């Protein structure tokens, strides 16, 4: 019983964490404000180096 429960929790975490990450990434991309802020910080870091 414990092994089955552990397997269920492990699979739930294994599937759930990437799903939550992808949903958060999708929301931040859709938001626009966060996406542009992320792009600005990336350009700011890459710009001065090159």
UniProtKB/Swiss-Prot annotation:
Q: Which GO terms describe its cellular component?
A: photosystem II; plasma membrane-derived thylakoid membrane
Topology relative to the lipid bilayer, per the entry, is: Single-pass membrane protein
Keyword Electron transport belongs to the record: no
Keyword hit for Amino-acid biosynthesis: no
SUPFAM superfamilies given in the database record: Photosystem II reaction center protein M, PsbM (SSF161033)
Q: What is its main location?
A: membrane
- Protein's cellular compartments: Cellular thylakoid membrane
GO BP terms: namely: photosynthesis, light reaction
Q: A Pfam family name for this chain?
A: PsbM
**TM annotation in the entry:** 7-27
Which keywords does the record carry? Membrane, Photosynthesis, Photosystem II, Reaction center, Thylakoid, Transmembrane, Transmembrane helix
Q: What does this protein's UniProt record list under function?
A: One of the components of the core complex of photosystem II (PSII). PSII is a light-driven water:plastoquinone oxidoreductase that uses light energy to abstract electrons from H(2)O, generating O(2) and a proton gradient subsequently used for ATP formation. It consists of a core antenna complex that captures photons, and an electron transfer chain that converts photonic excitation into a charge separation. This subunit is found at the monomer-monomer interface.
Q: How does it assemble?
A: PSII is composed of 1 copy each of membrane proteins PsbA, PsbB, PsbC, PsbD, PsbE, PsbF, PsbH, PsbI, PsbJ, PsbK, PsbL, PsbM, PsbT, PsbX, PsbY, Psb30/Ycf12, peripheral proteins PsbO, CyanoQ (PsbQ), PsbU, PsbV and a large number of cofactors. It forms dimeric complexes.
- Which protein family is named in the record? Belongs to the PsbM family.
Recorded protein name is Photosystem II reaction center protein M
């Amino acid at each position: 019983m414990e092994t089955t429960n552990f397997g269920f929790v492990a699979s739930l975490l294994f599937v759930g964490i990437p799903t939550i990450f992808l949903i958060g990434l999708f929301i931040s991309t859709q938001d626009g404000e966060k996406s542009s802020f992320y792009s600005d910080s990336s350009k700011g870091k890459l710009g001065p180096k090159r």
